[in-house]
């Protein structure tokens, strides 16, 4: 493949990534769950709901969430467990669903987990230099934190970002068997991403009657340095307000936002009463944002 370490870093900002060897998506999700449970200072048995955002499940069925439930030893507990596939927006979608479920459930485990290396063509420079495997998780509970959400989608009729799957239509047409590799039209993705990331941030700011000056940190989907820097430039915001760890992990799809949030917390970049925006985009096409206001809207 015609590439180099220098080319990858200059074009993407990514200098290292992690690739699972024997671990499945549920294994990574389980490890992230243990850390989230410890950080939340709750017991495993306190969990009422498990939502896993992934586009690389261990298998078609059962869901990865049910596999995580079993790994946590919670099969004898009443658990509402399910997966969603919002691609790289998946964690945001799961987070927003979880926040709506808090009126009925007390503790919700939300996980973004991917072993995206399974669906990468390692001879395709447009994708194989970008993606890595990983998982991140959060526990959502009731409290004074105010949340503002925005989510949207546009059916990808132009095959801008997709991976083939099972299709009766394809079978009837006697097409070649699917490779299941992820395919991406890079320039189209770039233009779409810059547009909708800015749009999504502006939506949650308008809902909350806040401005970027009121926001302590923006945690974007860790897709590409150039995408994030262009969004900051278009919004006339200093790039330092956008947290990035893609240089270390690459694009981990649905796992990127919870991994970045956890790292930002550990680095002391999220004040106890801080305001944080999570924003992302992905295949679908999907996109959205959540503003977390730890000042309780005050």
Regions found by a protein language model. Give the residues of each.
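Claisen-condensing/thiolase-fold acyl-transfer catalytic domains that form or cleave C-C bonds
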Residues: 26, 30-33, 37, 56-57, ...
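Condensing-enzyme catalytic core mediating Claisen C-C bond formation in acyl metabolism
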Residues: 1-22, 124-191, 195, 199, ...
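A contiguous, well-structured pocket-lining segment that forms one wall/lid of small-molecule binding clefts
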Residues: 177-246
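Glycine/charged-rich beta-loop-alpha catalytic/anionic-binding loops adjacent to active sites
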Residues: 14-15, 46-51, 72-85, 117-123, ...
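Acidic-glycine-rich active-site phosphate/pyrophosphate-binding loop
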Residues: 1-7, 60-74, 110-116, 168-175, ...
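Phosphate/pyrophosphate-binding loops at sites that engage ATP/ADP/AMP, CoA/4′-phosphopantetheine
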Residues: 2, 32-48, 199-216, 264-269
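Conserved beta-strand elements of the Class I
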Residues: 48-51, 109, 216, 277
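Flexible, glycine-rich active-site loops centered on histidine and acidic residues
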Residues: 105-135
